[in-house]
Amino acid sequence: MLGQRAGDGERPGLPGDGEGGVPARPGRRAERPPQRPAKVNKAVTCAAHLPGAAASRPLSPNKPDRVRPGQRDRIGAKRQRRRRADAGQARAASSRRVVPTAPEVLGAVASLPDRGRPTVARVATGSRLEGLFSAASLKLSALTQSLTRVRQAPTASGATIRLPASPVEMFLTSAFLTGFSFHCLYSGIGHGEDILASVEQITIVSRPLSGQRGAGPGNSAYTPRRSQGGPRAATTPGFRFPCRGLVRRAVLRLTVTVQDCILTALLAVSFHSIGVVIMTSSYLLGPVVK
């Protein structure tokens, strides 16, 4: 019985079963190599809690799960990449010297007017007007430089005369037009003074001829003489104006002279304005003489 029990307890293929081998000791389990644990799919295990996750399955069907070389330490690689990215962002922030904004600064920025509000519109309008004025000043300076640059005009003898500008530009210069206006005014005033002097000459002072109370039809009872004291001398006692038509003609001439002065002034102003318009148009369309 013992031999049979021992034989019953022997492992097949071992001695004692007719095949040779080491008989098993009673009371001890036969020594077998432990089974290796099956590999688990970590991706499936991590995503098992998500809705719609697929059922867990082995990496290799009908075979024990094995980790391929490309699947090793994926989580560690992700963590390393994340650390590198964080370090790069920190270096970029330190290089830009980013300073955290204080709450009061944010409040001040929020209180600024938005685009489209009247304050911003006024500021934009002021800047636009300032830009227009600066552009106009630049145009005037360029026009002045173009008018004052030296020109050379050939003469009949072959010599050249250095001119500050072309004759047309000189005529259209504001200084020339202003001088022309003053010249017209001065000439008009001088013309008026000449008329006043002629009025004094035309004034006739009555003086009886010596030894004659009367005069015949062929003799003149009065001789014209220029008054020594001006027009006031004609109003002295003993003098009278025998011919009122001359005085009327003198007054008419004086009125015409005043009108002539006014007309001259108006023409001078109109010439000046026309010159400015022509000068502006010539600048916009291009130089008059190249």
From Swiss-Prot:
Cystine crosslinks: none
Q: Where in the cell is it found?
A: Membrane
Task: Specify the superkingdom.
Answer: Eukaryota
Comp. bias intervals (Low complexity)? 87-97
Q: Does the keyword Membrane apply?
A: yes
Q: Which UniProt keywords apply?
A: Membrane, Transmembrane, Transmembrane helix
Asked whether the UniProt record includes tRNA-binding among its keywords, one would answer no
The UniProt annotation puts the region (Disordered) at 1-98, 209-236
Residues crossing the lipid bilayer are 261-281
Gene Ontology cellular component terms for the protein in this record: membrane
Q: How does the protein's chain sit in the membrane according to the entry?
A: Single-pass membrane protein
Give the compositionally biased regions (Basic and acidic residues).
63-76
The protein here is known as Uncharacterized protein ARIH2OS
Task: Name the species this protein comes from.
Answer: Homo sapiens
